[in-house]
Design a protein with these regions (language model features):
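Glycine-rich, low-complexity segments
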Residues: 1-28
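Terminal beta-strand-rich extracellular "head" domains
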Residues: 23-32, 43-147
Length: 147
């Protein structure tokens, strides 16, 4: 499959999508720690060494305590490194959220290797930080593409 971005701008380019993999979980993860805790995960076996991975994490809910900010990042457990983005979500008067986290990961990946990505979470203070919901489905999608 090819996707062509043809807006006429200099940053527009074509991209080739190689594969899409998806995982689902009905688990609830407690990330009420000031160090990162792994939560939902998804694995992909790459088809090309020229690939990037677009990783989309969609927890069905996020519950935070009133005295904390939640920090969320992507961990590549195969290589033991993290992506560049760290999302910070403030309590801001409501502890119930429904975020979508999108990470673009393209750090030295090798065709034929299987990479496992985890959404990790932590808190600024040790307070409630629950990702997911028992019985409801959260998902993680990885799109392998060449740009």
């Amino acid at each position: 499959m090819s996707i062509n971005f043809v807006g006429g701008d200099a940053q527009d380019s074509s991209m080739r999508m190689l594969q899409v993999v998806r995982s689902h979980t009905t688990s609830e993860f407690n990330a009420n720690s000031t160090t990162y805790v792994s939560t939902m995960s998804c694995a992909i076996t790459l088809r090309s060494s020229s690939s990037n991975c677009l990783v989309i994490c969609q927890p069905v809910r996020l519950v935070m305590g009133g005295s904390t900010d939640g920090m969320y990042r992507l961990l590549n457990t195969t290589q033991g490194n993290t992506g560049m983005n760290v999302f910070r979500i403030a309590y801001a008067g409501s502890g119930y959220k429904n975020p979508t986290f999108i990470f673009n990961y393209g750090t030295a990946l090798t065709a034929g290797n299987t990479y496992t990505f985890h959404l990790q979470g932590k808190t600024s203070t040790v307070d409630t930080n629950i990702i997911g919901d028992h019985g409801s489905t959260s998902s993680m999608t990885i799109i392998e593409y060449i740009s």
